[in-house]
Curated annotation (Swiss-Prot):
Stated name of the protein: GTP cyclohydrolase 1
Binding-site positions, Zn(2+): C84, H87, C157
Keyword Nucleotide-binding: yes
Family as reported in the entry's similarity comment: Belongs to the GTP cyclohydrolase I family.
Organism: Corynebacterium glutamicum (strain ATCC 13032 / DSM 20300 / JCM 1318 / BCRC 11384 / CCUG 27702 / LMG 3730 / NBRC 12168 / NCIMB 10025 / NRRL B-2784 / 534)
One cellular-component annotation, GO: cytoplasm
GO molecular function annotations of the record: GTP binding; GTP cyclohydrolase I activity; zinc ion binding
Length: 196
């Protein structure tokens, strides 16, 4: 499930030195007043931004409740922030996460869905994989009979470089189980995600 399991711990000292070298490489003076603390600040920011590399996101789904609930659970408009692994610039937007509990009726706390998305997002990432990882975790840990995850995000690698199209939104979806196999159920959950 999580292909980042063997990642080494964050090396803040090494990251600070690397940022200092990057400033030199782009033609800046890392010893000028405005940049003196920048390497350490950026290293601390990256430590937080990539914290998901050092966590197993599926652990947030270990606490469940046997509610006997057999219908859709959907949380919409969950803000997400991640870093494009190709350019190491942010992408950000919203995730919509829905599932129908399995036969056991196990549900998780609503905040756990947002936490799951955050933990998978806090690593070098691509939106397509992020979407699938969230869906697969719900199937694996909750034994959900149907899962739908939709992410809508703006990628700064498209907005501030290359094609330069700010405001362009990329939408990805991952459907599992009943939502994948039943067109009517899939259409219903996508309609609810759109808010109609």
């Amino acid at each position: 499930m999580d292909n980042h399991a063997a990642v080494r711990e964050f090396d803040e000292e090494r990251a600070t030195a690397a940022i200092r070298e990057l400033l030199i490489a782009v033609g800046e003076d890392p010893d000028r007043e405005g940049l003196l603390e920048t390497p350490a600040r950026v290293a601390r920011a990256y430590k937080e931004t990539f914290a998901g590399l050092h966590e197993d996101p599926t652990t947030v789904l270990e606490k469940t409740f046997s509610e006997g609930h057999e219908e859709l659970v959907l949380v919409r408009e969950i803000p997400i922030y991640s870093m494009c692994e190709h350019h190491l610039v942010p992408f950000f937007g919203v995730a919509h996460i829905g599932y129908i509990p399995g036969k056991s009726g196990k549900v998780t706390g609503l905040s756990k869905l947002a936490r799951l998305a955050d933990m998978f997002a806090k690593r070098p990432q691509v939106q397509e994989r992020l979407t699938s990882q969230i869906a697969d975790a719900l199937v694996e840990k909750l034994d959900a009979q149907a899962v739908a995850v939709v992410i809508e995000a703006e990628h700064l690698c498209m907005a501030m470089r290359g094609i330069r199209k700010p405001g362009a939104v990329t939408t990805t979806s991952a459907v599992r189980g009943g939502f994948k196999n039943n067109a009517a159920s899939r259409a219903e959950v996508f309609s609810l995600i759109r808010g109609h």
